[in-house]
Swiss-Prot record:
GO cellular component, as recorded: cytoplasm
Species of the source: Corynebacterium efficiens (strain DSM 44549 / YS-314 / AJ 12310 / JCM 11189 / NBRC 100395)
Annotated protein name in UniProt: Nucleoside diphosphate kinase
Top-level taxon of the source organism: Bacteria
Pfam (any one): NDK
InterPro entries on file: NDK-like_dom, NDK-like_dom_sf, Nucleoside_diP_kinase, Nucleoside_diP_kinase_AS
Length: 136
Protein backbone atom coordinates (compact mmCIF):
# COMPACT_ATOMS: atom_id res chain seq x y z
CA UNK A 1 0.00 0.00 0.00
CA UNK A 2 1.38 3.41 -0.97
CA UNK A 3 1.72 5.73 2.02
CA UNK A 4 3.14 9.12 2.90
CA UNK A 5 5.07 9.91 6.05
CA UNK A 6 6.70 12.93 7.58
CA UNK A 7 10.42 12.76 8.14
CA UNK A 8 12.58 15.22 10.02
CA UNK A 9 16.34 15.32 9.86
CA UNK A 10 16.84 17.02 13.19
CA UNK A 11 19.34 19.80 13.88
CA UNK A 12 22.05 17.34 14.95
CA UNK A 13 21.71 15.47 11.65
CA UNK A 14 22.00 18.71 9.68
CA UNK A 15 24.86 20.31 11.65
CA UNK A 16 26.86 17.07 11.71
CA UNK A 17 26.64 16.71 7.92
CA UNK A 18 24.46 13.60 7.59
CA UNK A 19 21.76 14.98 5.26
CA UNK A 20 23.23 13.61 2.03
CA UNK A 21 23.71 10.11 3.41
CA UNK A 22 20.22 10.04 4.94
CA UNK A 23 18.61 11.12 1.65
CA UNK A 24 20.69 8.53 -0.21
CA UNK A 25 19.44 5.81 2.16
CA UNK A 26 15.83 6.90 1.57
CA UNK A 27 16.31 6.69 -2.19
CA UNK A 28 18.18 3.36 -2.04
CA UNK A 29 15.22 1.94 -0.11
CA UNK A 30 13.01 2.83 -3.09
CA UNK A 31 11.11 5.62 -1.35
CA UNK A 32 10.33 8.90 -3.10
CA UNK A 33 10.86 12.40 -1.74
CA UNK A 34 7.57 14.24 -2.28
CA UNK A 35 8.65 17.39 -0.40
CA UNK A 36 11.86 18.60 1.23
CA UNK A 37 12.46 21.86 3.07
CA UNK A 38 15.44 23.21 5.01
CA UNK A 39 14.18 25.51 7.76
CA UNK A 40 14.56 26.60 11.35
CA UNK A 41 11.43 25.41 13.13
CA UNK A 42 9.52 28.03 15.06
CA UNK A 43 8.37 27.36 18.61
CA UNK A 44 4.68 27.09 17.66
CA UNK A 45 5.35 24.37 15.06
CA UNK A 46 7.61 22.46 17.46
CA UNK A 47 5.05 22.61 20.27
CA UNK A 48 2.27 21.39 17.96
CA UNK A 49 4.47 18.59 16.66
CA UNK A 50 5.38 17.37 20.16
CA UNK A 51 2.05 18.18 21.87
CA UNK A 52 1.61 14.57 23.04
CA UNK A 53 4.67 15.14 25.27
CA UNK A 54 3.54 18.52 26.65
CA UNK A 55 3.09 17.21 30.20
CA UNK A 56 6.41 15.35 30.29
CA UNK A 57 9.50 16.78 32.01
CA UNK A 58 11.59 16.73 28.82
CA UNK A 59 9.09 18.73 26.70
CA UNK A 60 10.84 22.10 27.06
CA UNK A 61 14.24 20.61 26.28
CA UNK A 62 12.80 18.83 23.23
CA UNK A 63 11.27 22.04 21.86
CA UNK A 64 14.49 23.97 22.53
CA UNK A 65 16.55 21.37 20.68
CA UNK A 66 14.31 21.09 17.61
CA UNK A 67 14.23 24.91 17.25
CA UNK A 68 17.96 25.42 17.94
CA UNK A 69 19.29 25.15 14.37
CA UNK A 70 18.17 24.28 10.83
CA UNK A 71 16.44 20.98 10.20
CA UNK A 72 15.06 19.22 7.15
CA UNK A 73 11.32 18.56 7.02
CA UNK A 74 10.22 16.18 4.32
CA UNK A 75 7.48 13.97 3.02
CA UNK A 76 8.48 10.52 1.88
CA UNK A 77 6.11 8.28 -0.03
CA UNK A 78 6.08 4.73 -1.28
CA UNK A 79 4.98 1.22 -0.54
CA UNK A 80 4.62 0.90 3.26
CA UNK A 81 6.56 4.16 3.63
CA UNK A 82 5.93 4.49 7.37
CA UNK A 83 7.36 1.08 8.25
CA UNK A 84 10.15 1.40 5.67
CA UNK A 85 11.27 4.77 7.09
CA UNK A 86 11.10 3.53 10.69
CA UNK A 87 13.25 0.54 9.71
CA UNK A 88 15.80 2.89 8.12
CA UNK A 89 15.75 5.20 11.15
CA UNK A 90 16.23 2.50 13.80
CA UNK A 91 15.12 2.51 17.44
CA UNK A 92 14.72 5.82 19.26
CA UNK A 93 17.48 4.98 21.74
CA UNK A 94 20.51 4.91 19.45
CA UNK A 95 22.72 2.96 21.84
CA UNK A 96 20.45 0.24 23.23
CA UNK A 97 17.71 -0.06 20.58
CA UNK A 98 19.08 1.10 17.22
CA UNK A 99 21.15 -1.47 15.42
CA UNK A 100 24.25 -0.62 13.41
CA UNK A 101 23.31 0.02 9.81
CA UNK A 102 20.31 2.15 10.78
CA UNK A 103 20.50 5.95 10.70
CA UNK A 104 20.34 6.27 14.47
CA UNK A 105 22.61 3.28 15.01
CA UNK A 106 25.24 4.85 12.77
CA UNK A 107 24.95 8.57 13.59
CA UNK A 108 23.33 9.14 17.03
CA UNK A 109 24.46 8.78 20.63
CA UNK A 110 21.56 10.01 22.78
CA UNK A 111 17.79 9.65 22.89
CA UNK A 112 17.40 13.45 22.92
CA UNK A 113 19.56 14.02 19.86
CA UNK A 114 18.81 10.99 17.72
CA UNK A 115 19.18 12.54 14.25
CA UNK A 116 15.78 11.80 12.69
CA UNK A 117 12.05 11.61 13.32
CA UNK A 118 9.37 9.70 11.48
CA UNK A 119 5.63 9.34 11.91
CA UNK A 120 4.62 6.13 13.67
CA UNK A 121 1.20 5.57 12.07
CA UNK A 122 -0.93 6.76 9.15
CA UNK A 123 -2.86 9.00 11.56
CA UNK A 124 0.33 10.54 12.96
CA UNK A 125 1.66 11.02 9.43
CA UNK A 126 -1.46 12.91 8.38
CA UNK A 127 -1.37 15.10 11.50
CA UNK A 128 2.38 15.80 11.28
CA UNK A 129 2.33 16.53 7.54
CA UNK A 130 -0.45 19.07 8.14
CA UNK A 131 1.71 20.78 10.81
CA UNK A 132 4.92 20.98 8.77
CA UNK A 133 3.38 21.31 5.28
CA UNK A 134 -0.03 22.97 5.81
CA UNK A 135 -0.39 23.84 2.11
CA UNK A 136 0.05 20.30 0.76
Amino acid sequence: MTERTLILIKPDGVTNGHVGEIIARIERKGLKLAALDLRVADRETAEKHYEEHADKPFFGELVEFITSAPLIAGIVEGERAIDAWRQLAGGTDPVSKATPGTIRGDFALTVGENVVHGSDSPESAEREISIWFPNL
